[in-house]
Amino acid sequence: MTTICAVKHNGKTAIAGDGQVTLGEKVIMKGSARKVRRIYNDKVAVGFAGGVADAINLEEKFENKLNEYSGNLERAAVELAQEWRGDRTLQKLEAMLIVIDKDNLLIVSGSGEVIVPDNGVLAIGSGGNYAQAAAVALSEYSKDMSAGEIAKAALNIAADIDIFTNHNIIVEELA
């Protein structure tokens, strides 16, 4: 399991993810997986939570949609969600994505939804609720922090609480 958190703050966006891969609920298989990546000529970043194979499959499909729609993040996300809803094989995938560009944060969920946040913060995964609460508070009360600093701090807070999230955090910030 893992935690991914994305933040839009002071005109920048950032996404952070930890590196823990868990087998079932008892064994940590790996602590340094990279679940946050830049794609589309480094103009978009994506983070995933859920089954690793499922998430990688969805990430590849999203990247194909992004190329098909010339980097239009919202259109690519909506098209992936429509495909996800309509394909019985995809419906069985257990993963979620957060995708960001310099202006937008979106969740693409397993039920085929595209979610835009009201408050500039999104989080998914086992520690998502903790990370989201921390990022909302930091965004509200720490105006001098960057989006990347907020996302990383939120992940560290989640890792202190959630046993399925670790402190091996990767941050990608887009300007």
Curated annotation (Swiss-Prot):
Q: Which CDD domains match?
A: protease_HslV
PROSITE patterns reported in the protein's UniProt record? PROTEASOME_BETA_2
Q: Does the keyword Lipoprotein apply?
A: no
The record describes its quaternary structure and partners as: A double ring-shaped homohexamer of HslV is capped on each side by a ring-shaped HslU homohexamer. The assembly of the HslU/HslV complex is dependent on binding of ATP.
Q: What class of enzyme is it?
A: hydrolase
Please name the Pfam families in this protein's record: Proteasome
Activity regulation statement: Allosterically activated by HslU binding.
Protein name (record):
ATP-dependent protease subunit HslV
List the catalytic residues.
T2
Its localization reads: Cytoplasm
